[in-house]
Amino acid sequence: MTTAAPDDSKNCIVAVTLDEESIGRSGPDIEHERAIAIYDLVEKNLFAPEGASEGPFTLHLGITGNRLMFDIRREDGTPVVAHLLSLSPFRRIVKDYFMICDSYYQAIRTATPDKIEAIDMGRRGIHDEGSRTLQERLAGKVRIDFETARRLFTLISVLHWKG
């Protein structure tokens, strides 16, 4: 007897909101990057809170102290679960990610294509590290695939971006 694989077509995030009180507003460039990160995440993702029936879900992100808050709800606003993740494991990764992104944007103006490609490979490697860390931190709480982890890490990074 085989067990059917779960139907994940409804296990997804359909909307993301940011807690303006804890995250705050930023300049137009950062707001634009946040909007892109949210769009990319909502466009394609796998997001299944452990123990919850199938979605779709909405996600409200905020910062409480030194923690990232994931407030997960149903489309109608009914609470599903809230998780608080320490930001500490992400601080070094986000800092390294911004440093290499700065190098990348500077290199685009003056460096050779080989140098730009090498920097971009490093940037992708750090992004992958952040994505794996996020998957590990959410393990047992929310099931996400690697691409969703990448999109969420992008959004978390943009939330840290002070410009």
From Swiss-Prot:
Pfam families: UPF0262. Belongs to the UPF0262 family. NCBIfam families: PRK02853.1 (NF002769). This is UPF0262 protein RPE_4483.
